[in-house]
Design a protein with these regions (language model features):
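Conserved RNA-binding domains used in RNP assembly and mRNA/RNA metabolism
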Residues: 1-81
Length: 81
């Protein structure tokens, strides 16, 4: 699965500080790009980097309930040097 680069638009929780009007609170729309390294019925997990042994670093788990759209990202692979 780690050969699939994706763009994910998703909604994150947001909080406010101090006193304010009730309608001042809003959600944050986030845009993330990474390698899809794991998925379940509840989450998608993307990573910034994939190692030679198919391990990964800097993983982000995004709840599917928060995801607005997922798009594949074309990646041009270069030959080994």
């Amino acid at each position: 699965m780690s050969d699939r680069a994706v763009y994910i638009e998703w909604v994150d929780s947001a909080s406010t500080r101090g006193w304010g009007e009730h309608d001042d609170a809003s959600l944050s729309v986030c845009h993330s790009v990474g390698w899809l390294v794991h998925k379940t019925k509840d989450i998608l997990v993307i990573s910034t980097s994939i190692g030679e042994n198919n391990d990964s670093i800097d993983r982000l788990a995004i709840p599917r309930a928060c995801i607005r759209k997922v798009r594949r990202v074309a990646v041009q692979k270069r030959g080994k040097r």
